[in-house]
Curated annotation (Swiss-Prot):
This is Ribonucleoside-diphosphate reductase small chain. It catalyses: a 2'-deoxyribonucleoside 5'-diphosphate + [thioredoxin]-disulfide + H2O = a ribonucleoside 5'-diphosphate + [thioredoxin]-dithiol. Gene3D superfamilies: Ribonucleotide Reductase, subunit A. PROSITE patterns: RIBORED_SMALL. The active site is at Y206. The keyword Cytoplasm does not apply. InterPro entries: Ferritin-like_SF (IPR009078), RNR-like (IPR012348), RNR_small (IPR033909), RNR_small_AS (IPR030475), RNR_small_fam (IPR000358). Ribonucleoside-diphosphate reductase holoenzyme provides the precursors necessary for viral DNA synthesis. Allows virus growth in non-dividing cells. Catalyzes the biosynthesis of deoxyribonucleotides from the corresponding ribonucleotides. Its EC number is 1.17.4.1.
Length: 417
């Protein structure tokens, strides 16, 4: 077999660490010609069963025999053989057919009958948690910001708000690109639609706090444009955007963004909740909005885990571990940047442990084994977890307004209707 052919196969498969999609075969400079059915079959097997590639071995040795590769010629002109394209399209359709929630056969325009009860219940829970930015009073926060916080306090809060202000927009970009139009079941469409609306509220809340607290124009603009101006936040945003634009499967993207909302967000939530441990009870508006948003995000991660459980073809544990390791490395860099100084009861070492604890919890919810096996280092977060997972708002003045969402049979007519 010629070295040119080996180079071609390594170019295709050597650049992919875990899975191979047929689109990646199109995105190379070399072209396949005279492709045998056996060759296409081998490609399909590689795609349908994600393979962890040993970088020390030639990819061609792992997947193809020399005899099979000898059936491949390299040409420099378009188009590919239509026969190859047919095999690729047929394979993609076969994968979708194996996932009912992605199949057009599952599409319906009416809400009822409900077929996926857990997804529907999640949607209803999201509705019960509905809140608006106008409910949050920031008057005391402004005084606390100016008079009761240290420079270190303000520094880490600004980092967290800067990340969150951009992150909710990134999450919505993923919902538009990879979720709401890809999943064909009505229950998920409802749940993703409500999530999209609440992510907008989150972004509005964080942006409002930045403009309210930070009066220096240059600093405020830097924070608002953090995905361009702050390296540790840019790295997080780049990782998210990599998955938005990736040609990996729905399962990959579902796992990746469950990590974004379940791991990237958790450390920042914990750092804000730490303020609640302060004796002076500073920044009440920031804290209560953080509670509202943490509740929402808990439901969003729950939705991702429910959707993942509905897939017939889930990722290998080693693949999920690799994705979560990448995310934790990026998150630890953000933590070190946000918390360069040790605060009372809060530092980068403890936060790193907390991130791994949260990652383990997410792995279990996705159906995998724990990887890090560490304890929750923050006692105060155990109490917060109870609040976040509860089905009521203890501090909302209008909590009663959503009390009848579950009571679908209760209909009241006005006397003069």
């Amino acid at each position: 077999m010629s070295s040119e052919k080996i180079k071609l196969v390594d170019e295709v498969f050597g650049s992919v660490k875990n899975t191979i999609t047929y689109e990646q075969l199109h995105n190379i400079n070399g072209k396949f010609h005279n492709i045998s059915d056996k060759f296409v079959e081998n490609i399909s097997e590689s795609i349908s069963e994600p393979t962890t590639i040993n970088s020390k071995k030639k990819t061609s040795e792992l997947i193809f025999s020399e005899e099979t590769l000898n059936n491949v010629e390299i040409i420099d002109t378009e188009p590919y053989l239509s026969d190859y394209h047919k095999h690729a399209i047929d394979f993609e359709n076969d994968v979708i057919m194996k996932e009912p929630i992605l199949s057009l056969k599952s599409e319906q325009y009416t809400v009822h009958p409900i077929k996926y009860q857990k997804v529907w219940d999640n949607y209803k829970d999201q509705m019960k948690n509905y809140w608006t930015v106008e409910e949050v009073d920031l008057a005391k926060d402004v005084n606390d910001w100016n008079n009761h916080l240290s420079d270190d306090d303000r520094n880490f809060i600004m980092h967290v708000l800067a990340f969150f202000a951009a992150a909710d927009g990134i999450v919505n970009a993923n919902i538009k690109e990879n979720l709401i139009d890809v999943v064909k079941i009505k229950e998920a469409e409802c749940a993703y639609g409500f999530q999209y609306a609440m992510e907008n509220a989150h972004g509005e809340m964080y942006s409002l706090m930045l403009t309210t607290f930070v009066k220096d124009d240059a600093l405020r603009n830097k924070l608002i444009n953090s995905i361009k101006t702050m390296p540790s936040i840019k790295k997080k945003a780049d990782w998210c955007n990599k998955w938005i634009k990736s040609d990996k499967t729905y399962a990959h993207k579902l796992v990746a963004f469950s990590i974004v909302e379940g791991v990237f967000f958790s450390g920042s939530f914990a750092s804000i909740f730490w303020l609640k441990t302060r004796e002076m009870h500073v920044m009440p508006g920031l804290i209560i909005s953080n509670q509202f948003i943490a509740r929402d995000e808990n439901k969003h991660v729950e939705l991702a885990c429910i959707m993942y459980s509905l897939l017939n073809n889930r990722l290998k544990e080693s693949v999920v571990y690799q994705i979560i390791d990448e995310a934790i490395e990026i998150e630890e860099e953000f933590i070190n940047d946000s918390l360069p100084c040790k605060l009372l009861g809060m530092n980068s070492e403890l936060m790193s442990q907390y991130i791994k604890y949260v990652a383990d919890r997410l792995l279990v919810d996705l159906g995998y084994r724990k990887k890090f096996n560490v304890d929750n280092p923050f006692e105060y977060m155990k109490k917060i977890d109870v609040f976040v997972k509860a089905n009521f708002f203890e501090k909302r003045n209008d909590a009663y307004s959503n009390a009848n969402i579950d009571n679908e049979k209760k209909i009241v007519f006005l006397e003069n209707f």
